[in-house]
Amino acid sequence: RRIFFWGLTAGILSAAASIIYKRIYEFAYEVTYAKIINIPVLVGANLIACLAAAIGFWTCLRLLRKKGEIIFNLIFSIGSFASVILPISANLPLDVQFPEMFPLLTVPMHFFPVIAWFTIRPLFANKLFIPAN
């Protein structure tokens, strides 16, 4: 239950960071990608990523016991780096202006869930999570 709320809180935090970053980016560069990335998409993607992370974290703890947290952290970090290929290789609609700037907006957002997860860890974990025997 605590892990679920950790994932939910991290998802909300990373969604808020994504929305703020998107608004700043669009204001600074005077571009918009509202047809592709909008608030429901950002909230949904961040919540799904962090809730999936919570499930993965719980699974790693159950299967790997004491090493579960460090293994999960490695998997989550590597997964964030690997997911960067998605916005880089995205095929945008032809009517999108400045398609070359789309990855500059979306690549940093791929790291927001993992950053939020690690940032709020002290609120949800006193020590390492060690499942009961």
For each of these PLM feature ranges, what is it?
Residues 2, 33-41, 67, 97-101:
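Juxtamembrane/transmembrane-helix boundary motifs in multi-pass membrane proteins
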Residues 2-6, 10-18, 107-133:
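Membrane-water interface at the C-terminal end of transmembrane alpha helices
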Residues 15, 77-88:
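Aromatic-anchored segments of alpha-helical transmembrane domains
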Residues 16-42:
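Membrane-helix boundary elements
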Residues 17-26, 57, 61, 65, ...:
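Membrane-water interface at transmembrane helix exits
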Residues 40-54:
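Generic alpha-helical transmembrane segments
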Residues 53-81:
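Loop-to-transmembrane helix junctions at the membrane interface
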Residues 85-105:
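Membrane-helix boundary connector in multi-pass membrane proteins
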